[in-house]
Amino acid sequence: MKPNKETYRILVIDDHPIVAEGIIALASQLEGVTCKGATCAKDVEQLTLKERFDLCIIDLELPDMNGFQLISHLHSQIPECGILIYTMHEEPWIIAKLSTLNINGAVSNMGHRTKRFFQWSGKMGERF
């Protein structure tokens, strides 16, 4: 997940605009970070054909493709890109499946119950 240039590019993928805008607002405050948002897999496909990203933050529930399919698509389209899942799902089978998908981490967005499913990799380039 090494930045390709001086700017670290993040793509936030969530079908709830207020969630995406919040994540973008927070991440954009970091020095050297630029963010874009997408609300569906179709938008992701168009964006990733035009430009590269260093990290994708993905909601598992999208209107036109499930997150597992999107992860697979991103691995083939931009294999060097890190992937962080941000989801309301805490079901054991989902966590187990995520742990097999070569992603960088997963975080629950369940309000006061927010917790990490598994540790976000702090070292550039590391994956699970």
Model-derived features with residue positions:
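Conserved acidic segment of CheY-like receiver
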Residues: 6-18, 23-27, 37
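Short hydrophobic/Thr-rich beta-strand motif most characteristic of the beta2 strand and flanking loop
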Residues: 32-40, 47
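Active-site residues of response regulator receiver
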Residues: 59, 87
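As written
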Residues: 67, 98-105
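The feature encodes the CheY-like receiver
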Residues: 63
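The C-terminal output helix
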Residues: 121-128
